[in-house]
């Protein structure tokens, strides 16, 4: 039986950084421990709080290696490797085992439940709550 930690599981985090930011704003820590996962939260926190000493931990060594690849891509301005401003299903932000599952779920949703236009419109920041209700009822 192979180990679940034999490859990158999550290429990106699907949570936001707001909880951590609230803790930092309220308690003003000098140091913080963060779970590595896809590295999105840790990289965001270092961007917002560059003086914060952030230690990143993950039980899966492949996740930490993945984060280091993201750091190298950012330092060298290799945004294509991160899938910024282009669509590349094999980039760093799409390389986890579970990311493929999320891509397949999205495709299935678009093909069987709602079209791509409706999905994009629903999640567009410019879409109002009323417009979202209309999309949901169609």
Question: PLM features: residue spans?
Answer:
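Class I SAM-dependent methyltransferase Rossmann-like catalytic core
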Residues: 1-27
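Phosphate/oxyanion-binding active-site loops and adjacent basic polyanion-contact surfaces
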Residues: 9, 34, 63
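Intrinsically disordered, low-complexity coil segments
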Residues: 25-28, 49-52
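Conserved class I S-adenosyl-L-methionine
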Residues: 28-40, 55
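Conserved SAM-binding loop of SAM-dependent methyltransferases across substrates and taxa
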Residues: 38-50
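Conserved acidic E/D residue at the C-terminus of a beta-strand in Rossmann-like folds
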Residues: 56-61
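Class I S-adenosyl-L-methionine-dependent methyltransferase module
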Residues: 62-138
